[in-house]
Curated annotation (Swiss-Prot):
This is Glutamyl-tRNA reductase. InterPro entries: 4pyrrol_synth_GluRdtase, 4pyrrol_synth_GluRdtase_dimer, 4pyrrol_synth_GluRdtase_N, GluRdtase_CS, GluRdtase_dimer_dom_sf, GluRdtase_N_sf, NAD(P)-bd_dom_sf, Shikm_DH/Glu-tRNA_Rdtase. Catalyzes the NADPH-dependent reduction of glutamyl-tRNA(Glu) to glutamate 1-semialdehyde (GSA). The record marks H96 as: Important for activity. Coiled coil: none annotated. It comes from the Bacteria. NADP(+) binds at G186, A187, G188, E189, M190, I191. Possesses an unusual extended V-shaped dimeric structure with each monomer consisting of three distinct domains arranged along a curved 'spinal' alpha-helix. The N-terminal catalytic domain specifically recognizes the glutamate moiety of the substrate. The second domain is the NADPH-binding domain, and the third C-terminal domain is responsible for dimerization.
Length: 418
């Protein structure tokens, strides 16, 4: 069987294409059911975040056409997808999974959210019955290495994430965040982090809007803000200098008209907006308005780079941990291969011995002389055990394979007793 990692991320595909390839939780469940029926797929998991969509699969020797499957499932042409799709196999696939889980392949180097997202992908696949053996074990290796990266390197010493980058970007736009009012849309982990970072910057006011107002109020209370429902967005928007949105809505929740009306009420005081969501929460046309500065996750790269330098050394240490893990994995796989050979050898020899033993027992039951029966049993068993190795060794000798003969001596003979 073969491990395959295939997908797109923020370095290969722009936000528009990543939107097309994003899977909601419900869509991921449908996709996993489809993968379960795909010929050649033994085990599989699907990871879908703002910045990447990836499949991790254990396949038969012939790798299925995942590009075709992904293109069909998202109504894209294979030609368009093939220009941005990457695929890793074997140890390279495992190393890629470790780099992703450790935050080394993220838009924000070392960001911690990706490990939780990968654990969720693992749990979904397990619940769908698509993790039942080797891939499940490989995921545990990945999680173990990712945990070591978090605890043994300084990659998480300075909190950096897409959420932090969004707030950092706002600091570049506004001279003093203490005089700014912020409106956050959503109530997931990303918005929780944004709220925390804004609170640390002592922003004047934080309002959190969510489909479930109770959840919004709960998050807002932790940072001294207030929670509202999505129905209250138009009014709240009139007060917002900073708007950061990250929901799981399949369609935009804020259009150009809503923002135009808010700007009129604000007497066209500028608004800074960051749309972290994929698919996007804010219609792209909003960015055409003269008093709006709209950014997506793809625009955050410059702000993110400020904190990347401090993590480069930690990233090198993390890469060393991954390389060590791959070496251990390779050694364990080789040991497992040896165990399989020994198991097969033992079963084969056991079958031979049982066959000869049954013959000997039958001879004893028929009144045969015990000593003669045992000697014949010994002679016959040794001959049967040595027949196949003898044929192979003669052929090796005839072919001039001296190294193989030395290896055979090492395997077959105990020199201490020779």
């Amino acid at each position: 069987m073969n491990l395959v990692a295939v997908g797109v991320n923020h370095t290969t595909a722009d936000v528009e294409l990543r939107e097309r390839l994003a899977f909601s939780t419900q869509q991921a469940e449908v996709a996993l059911a489809s993968l379960r029926e795909m010929p050649g797929v033994r085990e599989a998991a699907l990871l879908s975040t703002c910045n990447r969509t990836e499949l991790y699969c254990l396949t038969d020797d012939v790798t299925p056409n995942f590009a075709q499957w992904l293109a069909s499932s998202r109504n894209l042409s294979v030609e368009r997808l093939s220009t941005v799709l990457y695929q890793h196999t074997g140890e390279q696939a495992l190393e890629h999974m470790m780099r992703v889980a450790g935050g080394l392949d993220s838009l924000v180097l070392g960001e911690p959210q990706i490990l939780g997202q990968m654990r969720e992908a693992y749990a979904r696949a397990h619940e769908a019955g698509l993790l039942n053996g080797e891939l499940s074990r490989l995921f545990q290796e990945v999680f173990s290495v990712a945990k070591r990266i978090r605890t043994e390197t300084g990659i998480g010493a300075n909190p950096v994430s897409v959420a932090y980058a969004a707030v950092s970007f706002a600091r570049h736009i506004f001279a003093d965040l203490k005089k700014s009012r912020a409106l956050l849309i959503g109530a997931g982990e990303m918005i929780e982090l944004v709220a925390r970072h804004l609170s640390e910057q002592q922003v004047q006011e934080i309002t959190i809007a969510n489909r479930t107002q109770e959840r919004a109020s709960e998050l807002a209370a932790a940072v001294g803000g207030r929670g509202i429902s999505l129905e209250e967005l138009p009014v709240a928007l009139e007060r917002a200098d900073i708007l950061i949105s990250c929901t799981a809505a399949p369609l935009p929740i804020m259009g150009k008209g809503m923002v135009e009306r808010a700007l009129k009420k604000r007497r066209h005081r500028p608004m800074f907006m960051v749309d972290i969501a994929v698919p996007r929460d804010i219609e792209p046309e909003v960015g055409e308005l003269g008093d709006v500065y709209l950014y997506t996750v793809d625009h955050l790269q410059e702000a993110i780079q400020e904190n990347v330098r401090s993590r480069q050394q930690a990233a090198q240490e993390a890469s060393e941990l991954i390389r060590d893990a791959i070496v251990r994995h390779r050694r364990q796989r080789r040991e497992q291969d040896a165990v399989k050979v020994l198991r097969d050898y033992r079963e084969q020899r056991k079958a031979m011995a049982e066959s000869e033993l049954e013959k000997a027992l039958q001879q004893l039951r028929n009144g045969g002389d015990a000593e003669q029966v045992l000697r014949r049993f010994q002679h016959s068993l040794v001959n049967k055990w040595l027949h196949s190795p003898s044929v192979t060794l003669r052929k090796m000798a005839a072919d001039g394979r001296a190294e193989a003969l030395l290896l055979a001596r090492e395997l077959l003979l105990d020199d201490d007793q020779s």
